[in-house]
UniProtKB/Swiss-Prot annotation:
It comes from Emericella nidulans (strain FGSC A4 / ATCC 38163 / CBS 112.46 / NRRL 194 / M139) (Aspergillus nidulans). It comes from the Eukaryota. Belongs to the quinolone epoxide rearrangement protein penF family. The keyword Signal does not apply. Its EC number is 4.2.-.-. Pfam families: DA_N. The keyword Lyase applies. This is Quinolone epoxide rearrangement protein asqO.
């Protein structure tokens, strides 16, 4: 299906030209051409990026996660999805709007719950703030100035109630730039990113089918979207975030279907940016231990962990190591995992912390 991009779409430019906006999405696909934003707009980091609505091959999701630093195994991820059936390759609930809730309890037991927003979704944005409500799913999120977000769920049909609150400790960014007007939002061809919270202090207080999930830890929030099915753009993908002492880290290392390797590196020290870029090998991620073939193909089990090498230039190298502990989502195409995190500058003080990581693997072995 043909996609018309931002610069050739007068309608999309007009729709997103104002700082304040509101859109209501129905629980059905758009049967036509969808327009996709590629260049950032002022104070619209969390605004919808696909207009007038997703069709069968496009997608966007508002993603929030939390990893406990007060217990070993606890985590929570909430994704507000707006997707065509071919967009993400995820379970399709009969319409484009769904909320996926996944996580793990202190005993290491993982769960995934998907609920459809059959009554549609409403998004409002302006002045750096945003509010989204997925109606029929009992789920919403709200944020202000990219500094604090709250995710709320009250859905008796799936037995999930609670709130997640995230307070930023690392400034917002795009794949290759800090937050600014008219920055490129492209992560890889046909895939885009706006990362409002690369790192956050998070508080989680949830009840999942009468089991308590309550902890403090590190959090993360972004908005991702695509102009073509994810599987058609990505062969394999390593992503993650973590905190080591005063350092906040995010990594993307993606092998595209075009055979090229794409990178997006981010490190802040006490909230100050010391690395932001997409240069080759700015962050090199490789699996280690069991199942450490590169690149991974569909059906490959999760590796023991990942080694990360950030190149800040001028002979400054930051080395980090992720050790897998809990598989939250584990299927032929997706690994969503939490684990131990350690590292620091070569020759400098070393730190320990926690991290969340994803591995996508759509290519054949």
């Amino acid at each position: 299906m043909q996609i018309v991009y931002l610069f050739s779409s007068v309608l999309l430019t007009a729709a997103l030209a104002h700082e304040n906006g509101k859109v209501a999405y129905p629980f059905r696909l758009f049967n036509g051409t969808s327009s996709v934003e590629e260049i950032s707009q002022q104070d619209q980091m969390d605004a919808p990026k696909i207009m007038p609505h997703v069709n069968a091959t496009t997608f966007e999701w508002w993603y929030f996660d939390a990893v406990s630093t007060t217990s070993q195994n606890e985590s929570l991820t909430v994704m507000f999805e707006n997707m065509g059936p071919e967009g993400l390759g995820a379970p399709y609930p009969g319409g484009p709007l769904a909320v996926q809730i996944s996580g793990s309890f202190s005993n290491g037991t993982a769960f995934t719950i998907i609920t459809a927003a059959t009554k549609g979704a409403v998004l409002e944005w302006g002045g750096g703030g945003v509010r989204g409500e997925w109606r029929g799913a009992g789920s919403s999120f709200a944020g202000k100035d990219h500094r604090e977000y709250t995710v709320s769920i009250a859905n008796p049909g799936i037995g999930v109630y609670g709130t997640m609150t995230l307070r930023s400790v690392s400034p917002p960014r795009y794949p290759c730039d800090v937050k600014e007007r008219r920055a490129s939002e492209q992560l890889i061809p046909n895939m885009y990113l706006a990362n409002s919270q690369p790192d956050a202090i998070v508080e989680v207080d949830f009840n999942i089918n009468e089991s308590t999930l309550k902890f403090s830890g590190i959090g993360y929030h972004d908005l991702s979207w695509g102009s073509a099915p994810l599987e058609s753009s990505v062969h394999s993908w390593y992503w993650g975030h973590g905190r080591l002492g005063r350092y906040s880290l995010v990594w993307f290392d993606v092998m595209g279907r075009d055979g090229k390797e794409y990178f997006s590196a981010w490190i802040t020290e006490a909230g100050n940016v010391i690395l932001c870029g997409c240069e080759p090998d700015s962050v090199l991620v490789r699996p280690w231990g069991e199942n450490s073939g590169f690149p991974p193909g569909r059906g490959t089990p999760a590796p023991s962990g990942y080694s990360l090498r950030y190149d800040l230039g001028q002979n400054q190298i930051f080395i980090a190591n992720f050790t897998r502990e809990v598989n939250i989502i584990d299927n032929d195409f997706t690994k969503h995992i939490i684990g131990l995190f350690s590292g620091g500058f070569e020759g400098g003080e070393q730190y320990e912390g926690r991290a969340m990581a994803d591995q996508f693997q759509f290519g054949d072995l």
